[in-house]
Amino acid sequence: MPEEASHLFEIATPLGFSVRTTTDYWALIESKHPEIAGHRPAVERCLREPDQIRHSKQDNAVYLFYRSYPPHHLCAVTKRLNDDGFVITCYLTDKIKEGEKIWPTSA
């Protein structure tokens, strides 16, 4: 099967790069985080319209996109290599991580 056939989504982020994932990788995320199953539109919106974006404390190429998803926050973790962005994982959390907040920027 060609790689293009398994392409699930590609979302333009506020940081100026796009994030993508495949059907197979999305299935892996859903198996590891069953609370995300059926919530792909919310994850896509989190990438497109996050409440905030933070850099990972461990890896400067990793970005954590957060959006309120009461009573939790939805977190979409992405990695950017050159101009190629991809989803690492997604999950619900009670707390936003401590990484450096990079978006939105303060005036």
Question: Locations of the language-model features?
Answer:
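Ribonuclease/tRNase effector modules and their secretory precursors
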Residues: M1-A107
